């Protein structure tokens, strides 16, 4: 097979991969526009008939209707796809460990779940702008986010590097990133880690480590969607793709003939949080109720069952306290 045919086959393969995670044509055929500074991208409504955990027998908390975006519903902002935590099933419904957790929280508050698919780097602005009640979207807890919202710990994950099968650029350590291209989603902690932003301001991040040592800078390639960064790796536009460990592991497990993890190079185990708007004087009713519902799930084992369903139980937490 000649090189042009190989490239075409590769592109078709990755298209099938991404489609398997986001198969709803209504959501995926038109790319989301990049918001201009100061603007919030309008969240895209997605179907909400996703499989949910079995109904609970009792409601553990309530939220006044006038505090909800839509009465009777817990509206969740999430950046889809980001499997296995949030993605679309074959029928175009949102699913994943984060989505199932959100559904069960809503259930325990006597509510139905609604999902708004929202660009990740505008997701906090969407919450603060009244587009949703909470965010469940694999958000790492950091100081910059805590200055804007309150966050309830619900998971923990590291950061991993995915490379093409055979690791053609021989990336084994962070030093090997110097002078190479790295694909990453905008607004993520991984992007901060590369650029020396957020919680990595003090150390300067991975790029500064290269330049301070007299080595070539990392060629950081930011993408609006995590799936775009994966596509860049598949089409050889970047040497590696930097993302949360559960997401990296998912893609490698699903397509072991195309991708592999950089063994032994998992960085920064960080807790992820459910984001809620800050209350005017202490925690809001939404924060208190969501926290109570989540802790009840942890205590009765439902939470761990959900994580185990998606093979991410290694990221389980035992408490909703920081």
What residue spans do the PLM features occupy?
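A ligand-binding cleft/hinge motif common to bilobed small-molecule-binding domains
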Residues: 121, 139-146, 194-197, 234-269
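Short helices/loops that flank or line small-molecule/ion binding pockets
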Residues: 103-108, 116-117, 121-134, 148-149, ...
